[in-house]
């Protein structure tokens, strides 16, 4: 008996040390990804030029004052670095929201857009592009209506799911499907009656996702929102673990998941709303990344959330780099590339017989 206990303790220590090692490794890889990604782009810049701009802006080294302005400064500081940091924030947001949504609806196939957020955002963007709604917002004329559409859709789904009793996982999924269908129908109707091919092309490009509109102002909004929401969810890992067991079990343990579920949905919707505002709709990140981490480290959200955040951030950074360099003098929509990578990975996850969700095999 004592030998079994000692072996169990030894195994848990090994798993904990492995988790810490992987956490540190992913954090180091994320830092490396940021530093490496800013060296890629259509402009042919040397490593010295790139890092000299960063060093001057961060530490104000007088010997590098030549990089305080000019074309090299603008490319590195105003275009590349904000884009990399925005990819970090959006990738982190999508991955963490994927983890949370899968726990909330108790469905391993759920993604951040399960509540119809993508359809609501697309409707907002369609109205902005096709009808000129939000034209007074200037550079945010598409992003702000898309954000509003995403948030309105989320709250509508939550309200519908709470009609006739408390919201359950099944009611949330069904309400999301219904609202998503309505938003898609209205989007198609607006495109049909407007009959503007150029505007329709713009809607299609927006729906594919892009980080080309990155700026320091967007990073200044997206990054703090993401970090705050991630911290909120990480402090709630015990309740997220309970959600995988179901409402009946949680009630017997003295926890009412109904209010928590609504709160988590609102926080996740805010985070996804800002992600849509900054980058459009990018799929599969919030679906595949949580599964990869869950396969390696199980379903404990104390580990699942930070690891998913780090891996998702690095993944989207490198996807964006690929989008910039694959096509010469052009840029591939990041949503297309992520889907090309994510779909085969997701199919592989589906056929794995040894993989379970929430403790079920």
Give, region by region, the residue ranges found by the protein language model.
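Alpha-helical transmembrane segments in inner-membrane proteins
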Residues: 2-361
């Amino acid at each position: 008996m004592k030998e079994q206990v000692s072996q169990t303790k030894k195994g848990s220590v090994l798993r904990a040390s492995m988790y810490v090692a992987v956490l540190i490794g992913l954090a180091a890889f994320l830092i490396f990804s940021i530093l490496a990604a800013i060296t890629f782009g259509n402009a042919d810049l040397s490593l010295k030029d790139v890092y000299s701009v960063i060093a001057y802006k961060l530490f104000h080294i007088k010997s590098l004052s030549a990089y305080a302005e000019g074309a090299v400064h603008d490319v590195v500081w105003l275009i590349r670095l904000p884009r990399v940091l925005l990819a970090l924030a959006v990738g982190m947001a999508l991955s963490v929201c994927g983890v949370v949504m899968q726990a909330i609806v108790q469905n391993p196939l759920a993604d951040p857009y399960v509540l119809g957020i993508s359809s609501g955002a697309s409707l907002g963007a369609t109205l902005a592009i096709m009808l000129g709604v939000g034209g007074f917002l200037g550079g945010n004329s598409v992003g702000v209506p898309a954000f509003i559409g995403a948030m309105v859709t989320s709250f509508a789904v939550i309200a519908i799911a709470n009609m006739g009793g408390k919201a359950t996982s099944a009611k949330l999924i069904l309400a999301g499907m219904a609202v998503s269908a309505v938003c898609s129908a209205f989007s198609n109707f607006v495109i049909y009656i407007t009959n503007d091919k150029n505007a329709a092309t713009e809607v299609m490009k927006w729906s594919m996702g892009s980080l080309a509109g990155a700026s320091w102002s967007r990073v200044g909004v997206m990054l703090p929102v993401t970090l705050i929401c991630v911290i909120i969810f990480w402090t709630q890992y015990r309740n997220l673990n309970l959600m995988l067991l179901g409402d009946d079990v949680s009630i017997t343990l003295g926890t009412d998941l109904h209010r928590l579920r609504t709160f988590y949905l609102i926080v996740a919707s805010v985070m996804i709303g800002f992600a849509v505002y900054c980058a459009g709709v990018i799929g599969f990140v919030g679906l595949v990344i949580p599964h990869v981490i869950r396969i390696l480290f199980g379903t404990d959200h104390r580990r699942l959330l930070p690891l998913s955040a780090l891996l998702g951030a690095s993944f989207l950074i490198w996807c964006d780099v690929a989008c910039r360099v694959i096509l010469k003098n052009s840029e591939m929509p990041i949503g297309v590339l992520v889907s090309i990578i994510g779909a085969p990975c997701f199919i592989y996850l589906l056929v794995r017989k040894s993989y379970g969700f929430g403790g079920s095999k």
